[in-house]
Swiss-Prot record:
Pathway: Nitrogen metabolism; urea degradation; CO(2) and NH(3) from urea (urease route): step 1/1. It comes from the Bacteria. The gene is ureA1. Heterotrimer of UreA (gamma), UreB (beta) and UreC (alpha) subunits. Three heterotrimers associate to form the active enzyme. CDD domains: Urease_gamma. Signal peptide: none annotated. One of its GO terms (cellular component) is cytoplasm. It comes from Psychrobacter cryohalolentis (strain ATCC BAA-1226 / DSM 17306 / VKM B-2378 / K5). One of its GO terms (biological process) is urea catabolic process. This is Urease subunit gamma 1. One of its GO terms (molecular function) is nickel cation binding. Belongs to the urease gamma subunit family.
């Protein structure tokens, strides 16, 4: 199987998102890379399922709370930008203050 560099990046992000999801399910607080990966992965999956950019911008703020992450992580993440594939093409989704 031949993957483009972009496909490899998406696969690595998805794998990191799965790991973060498992750790969250165990009750562990997520660190910075895990929080970014989980939110990004959820946005990419929502886009693939046919949700809109506006829906994903809103949903991106509901994935994690301060209680889900280590101290200081919410302040480190001012915004997240994810290039996601929607049914009508690839679009950039920006989520401001994703952890409230």
């Amino acid at each position: 199987m031949e993957l483009t560099p972009r496909d490899k990046d998406k696969l690595m992000l998805f794998t990191a998102g799965l790991l973060a999801e498992r750790r969250k399910a165990k009750g562990l607080k997520l660190n910075y890379p895990e929080a970014i990966a989980l939110i990004s992965c959820e946005i990419m999956e929502g886009a693939r399922e046919g949700r809109t950019v506006a829906e994903m911008m809103g949903a991106g703020r509901e994935i994690l709370t301060r209680d889900d992450v280590m101290e200081g992580v919410p302040e480190m993440i001012e915004s997240i930008q994810v290039e996601a594939t929607f049914p009508d093409g690839t679009k950039l989704v920006t989520v401001h203050s994703p952890i409230i």
